[in-house]
Amino acid sequence: MSFFQLDSTPAPRALAAMCGGAVLALAACMGAQATVYNPPIQLSNGIEYMSGGIGSDEAELMRTVEPRWPAVFEFAVKDGRKADFAADVTLTVRDAQGRMVLDHVRASGPYLVARLEPGKYSAEAMLSGQVLQREVTVGGPGTSSRNVFEWPQGTNMQSASSS
């Protein structure tokens, strides 16, 4: 047998097929792992915002990006001694002159981050018809204003029981 001639016996071919199969199986397993993507950045009156946080991976991602956004809103419903995350919240934010900067935007998860300019704002969040209001102050570059809206226990159930 020449130095450059391949052995054509079945054993090396079977071994190569098994190795190839193992590589493909490993690639399939790696591809099956959950990949978390940033929720889409959206616009309201020229203001960028992003909402999400459904599921532990996406919630962790939102907590990771929070420091890069000047305004952070978190939505929850009181549940005894703790609070559960709330989703499907409608948020409206007005600047100090009363102009709407976020116009009835829907938070698809318990977190919403927005690129608001430094200043004072009035924020109104609605869940199941119940409205909470907060005064919000956004600081200068490199700071993040965290604003938590927490509804009373059973708020989400009001809309579920009325249908």
Model-derived features with residue positions:
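Bacterial N-terminal signal peptides
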Residues: 17-27
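Short, surface-exposed beta-strand/beta-hairpin micro-motifs centered on an aromatic residue
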Residues: 109-115
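Beta-strand-rich interaction surfaces with strong enrichment in secreted/lumenal proteins
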Residues: 101-102, 112, 134-138
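Detector for glycine-centered tight turns/loop "hinges" at secondary-structure junctions
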Residues: 24, 34, 98-99
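N-terminal secretory signal peptides that target proteins for export/translocation
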Residues: 1-13
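A short tyrosine-centered beta-strand micro-motif
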Residues: 119-125
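Short, acidic Ser/Thr/Gly-rich low-complexity loop/linker segments typical of extracellular
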Residues: 98-108
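Primarily secretory-pathway and cell-envelope proteins
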Residues: 32-89, 93, 130-163
